[in-house]
Amino acid sequence: MKKSKVADLIVQHVQKQLFMALSDAIYAASKRSYDYAQKKKLDHRATALGYDRHLNLNETIYEVFEANGCNPGKLRGNRIVEGHSGIFTIVRESYNDNQWKRLFRSKRKQELIAENVSVEKVVQPDLFSDGSDVPKATLFVVCRFSGSLQNHPEAPMTVQL
C-alpha cells in the first residue's frame, strides 16, 4: 500500500475523536431533518428536508467543533461553519447527486480551496519546493445525499474528506 503524505498530515493535526464526532453528528442531524420533513405536506417535503438538513448540520457540527476545541466561527444563516484543528480549517459541504456542479462556487469556498495550494506541492512537488512545508490547509467533509425522497433520503449516501 502506498503511503499518503496528505493522510499523514491529517493524522498529525486532526484528532481521531473529532472525525468520529463529526460522523456521528452528520448522521444524527440528517436523521433528525428527515423525521422533521416527514411531517410536512408532500409538496413541501423535499424543500423542508433541504432547509432543515442545512440548519441541523450547521448547528450540530458547530457543537462538535465547540466540544473539541476547534474554535468555530459565529453560527449565522447560510454562512459556512468552520472549525480549526492544527493547520487545518475544517468545513462541511453537502450536495445532492443532481447538483454536484455547484458544489464549490461561493467566494468563501474558493478562498478555502486556495489555502490548499501548499498541499498540492506535497502531492506533486515542483522544482522550487519539496512540499514539506504546509502552513495551513482546508479539509472539506463532503456529504453526498441522493437528492431523492424515495432513495435513501434520511442519511448521506457517502461522507468523504
Name each model-derived stretch.
Residues 47, 65-91:
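A short acidic/basic microdomain associated with nuclease active sites
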Residues 1-51:
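Interdomain/boundary linker segments immediately adjacent to catalytic/signaling cores
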Residues 27-40, 89-104:
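N-terminal short leaders/motifs
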Residues 91-159:
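A recognition module on extended beta-rich or small alphabeta surfaces enriched in W/G with H and D/E
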Residues 3, 85-86, 103, 128:
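Solvent-exposed interaction surfaces and binding hotspots enriched for charged
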Residues 50, 54, 58:
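Nuclease catalytic cores
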